[in-house]
């Protein structure tokens, strides 16, 4: 944090003493302070160090083993500048293999950090990132095949903040941790003794791993002292399987200024902001009075995700206004998007996402046996019963020898790291048609090595705030089309990935490799 920002925030926290007595009591005692990840910049040699290790974190009254980058849980926000090369030295102090994927970065397959980029226990990997893409909020996380869900659940995730000349000219809020605030939202399930309770089994392979505790930057319902004016929130849905739907507790609007790959042409005003797993959106919200309010996530129509306490609006964080003013603004225009090129004559690739019917049926049965009808709130019951072969449900063996590890597929094939499915042409636009027809599950589909444009999303034109640069598209029982282009090489040994970002689907086969 720069000295002037530190001094200003120190003053801001001091001003909390000027709040009304009741407000001070709420601020001081009721909620933990929102943890702010360190903003990690390069050293004099243009290098950054990330150390992956295990530690201890406290959630409520219990302490759990967690994993983190440069700490016990989560990680720093790595700051990158467009046009400036950075070398990242990654040290793995875990007792198992891992990888580090740069989600949203347009970098060659050699440094993308997919499942082939293994860092052994006690090992080191160095990658040089030549950043040449617009300012954006991206992130990094493990991509160890078959274990991505568990390693993310244990705590491994960090932000990437890309800056360029264009964004620095805008008067957006930019005081890190004060009026420019990272918000990493994840749900967790804990065992009776307080440890993270991760399971990859038939049920989670079908619907994903989810929990009943929501963490924001690793804390339960924290609060943030915000100066008056515009507050910028960099939202990341870091959940394994839970989609979120952000809103405010007092219905003040959110102004979306950026999606996965950077700024929108102009702010988009919304009252609700659905965010899929792995997606990022930057929003501005006006803090223009003395009234505290909550950022909340509203109930979603996703299998298993309306189980209490998520059957009603659930607090993500409290925003507590303080008596000083910030200087950031909400510009009328933000950036320019290139016009979509002609789609005539482009290579068309068709990807059919599918789940083994046995997995569907067994997973849903186990979900309903564990959680009851609440697990299906908001779902189409007639469609579900058809999917589950309801008449046969009582004759299932609850797992037996069923191989759920390869039960999710793309174009009829479970992921094979040694067999890329196709070769994309470098520097050429392609039209990818991604279908979830015949499958009722939510599949946020993520493509490595590119930022694309959504042509249609689940059979409809994309919403205004989803029409900019994206690396993830919603596929849910329908067809989505995206316009992609790859500007870097990805040879067979370091192929790019395209996969469902519901991590348990990815870990059980719904992923493909492709070369450029």
Curated annotation (Swiss-Prot):
Cu cation 4 binds at residues 443, 500, 505. Binds 4 Cu cations per monomer. GO terms for molecular function: copper ion binding; oxidoreductase activity. GO terms for cellular component: periplasmic space. InterPro entries: Cu-oxidase-like_N (IPR011707), Cu-oxidase_2nd (IPR001117), Cu-oxidase_C (IPR011706), Cu-oxidase_fam (IPR045087), Cu_oxidase_Cu_BS (IPR002355), Cupredoxin (IPR008972), TAT_signal (IPR006311). Residues 1-28 form the signal peptide. Cu cation 3 binds at residues 143, 448, 499. CDD domains: CuRO_1_CueO_FtsP, CuRO_2_CueO_FtsP, CuRO_3_CueO_FtsP. Cu cation 1 binds at residues 101, 446. Its EC number is 1.16.3.4. It is found in: Periplasm. It comes from the Bacteria. Disulfide bonds: none annotated. Pfam families: Cu-oxidase, Cu-oxidase_2, Cu-oxidase_3. This is Multicopper oxidase CueO. It comes from Escherichia coli O157:H7.
